[in-house]
């Protein structure tokens, strides 16, 4: 069963550059983490045509947005589905009250700060420029984050290598606020989309991924037409016959997943055997639960990797898991492509140890 799950999830995640366009890849996996270089590398893995300028172009064309979504992390999502994703995962304003109090913002101060921030974000503005414009506001960025959770402010990426952001008022960028969508209907839609991209999966997987309580996750999945293939693993009914006939993966396929890739973050702890053997989970995930950058061989995690830049040289360290052999020539070309995307003039790979 594990091999079938691995092959199926690899296909449904569109790994191996399975689709032509990054917009299609993004729709098929629902969302990718907004952080850079996670977002561009996640799209590079899944689309045949992706280069350094493509993500910026998608943002300027308003094809994608960066919004608080699953588990209140910031995700890059298709603009067309953003209202439903936002509505399904949005926290009520009272849930942010503690954060505002911690920043010294009562209701009146927050309302005043919102107005000031909106005045300064009619055009994209960097965080540093915003701080200069409102120098007396020590609580500024906390207020901006809560405004994003209200759908009033959006983030824009500026660099593929690092998470350098600009902020812009949603209404100024889109000419309107995000459409209001029904939260429950949106959650039911999200549950069905999740199973199509990440199934077969358990109720606890969807609850963990989405950040909603288990009872709400269960109720949302209860509205979907699914089959239980065993062990509580749910699959859309119309995918069952194709799932049962899926072919094993080529054992020599190679994929480089970035930190927080959609696939590594798609299932709860205890449900990740299709991606990584139980004995290696501690090498594939940080204690906090963050999915680490991984080298996949035949859809199975065999090493962790990290990188840093020295000028324009990209220095890569690959750390194979215990009792896993990964010849350098197996992944060298894949890292060259990552370096090309991130503007490296040279890529140097070294072996690491746990």
Question: Where do the language-model regions lie?
Answer:
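Long, low-complexity intrinsically disordered regions
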Residues: 1-264, 268-272, 276-354
């Amino acid at each position: 069963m594990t091999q079938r799950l691995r092959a199926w999830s690899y296909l449904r995640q569109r790994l191996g550059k399975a689709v032509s366009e990054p917009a299609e890849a993004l729709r098929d996996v629902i969302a990718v983490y907004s952080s850079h270089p996670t977002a561009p590398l996640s799209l590079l893995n899944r689309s045949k045509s992706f280069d350094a300028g493509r993500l910026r172009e998608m943002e300027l064309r308003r094809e994608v947005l960066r919004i608080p979504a699953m588990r209140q992390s910031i995700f890059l999502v298709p603009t067309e589905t953003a209202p439903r994703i936002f509505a399904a995962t949005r926290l009520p304003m009272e849930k942010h009250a503690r954060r505002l109090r911690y920043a010294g913002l009562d209701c009146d101060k927050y309302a005043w700060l919102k107005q000031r921030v909106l005045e300064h974000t009619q055009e994209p503005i960097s965080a540093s420029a915003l701080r200069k414009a409102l120098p007396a506001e020590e609580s500024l960025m906390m207020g901006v984050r809560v405004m994003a959770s209200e759908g009033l402010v959006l983030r824009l990426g500026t660099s593929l290598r690092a998470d350098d952001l600009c902020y812009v008022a949603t209404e100024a960028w889109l000419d309107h606020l995000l459409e209001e969508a029904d939260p429950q209907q949106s959650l039911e839609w999200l549950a069905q989309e999740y199973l199509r991209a990440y199934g077969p999966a358990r109720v606890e997987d969807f609850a963990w991924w989405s950040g909603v309580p288990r009872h709400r996750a269960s109720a949302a999945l209860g509205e979907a037409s699914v089959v239980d293939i065993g062990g509580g693993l749910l699959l859309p009914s119309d995918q069952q016959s194709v799932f049962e006939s899926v072919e094993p993966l080529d054992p020599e396929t190679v994929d480089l997943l970035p930190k927080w890739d959609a696939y590594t973050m798609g299932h709860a702890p205890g449900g990740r055997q299709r991606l990584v053997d139980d004995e290696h989970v501690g090498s594939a995930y940080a204690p906090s639960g963050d999915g680490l950058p991984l080298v996949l061989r035949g859809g199975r995690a065999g090493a962790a990797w990290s990188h840093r830049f020295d000028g324009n040289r990209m220095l890569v360290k690959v750390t194979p898991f215990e009792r896993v052999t990964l010849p350098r020539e197996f992944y060298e070309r894949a890292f060259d492509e990552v370096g090309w995307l991130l503007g490296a003039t040279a890529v140097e790979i070294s072996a690491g140890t746990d």
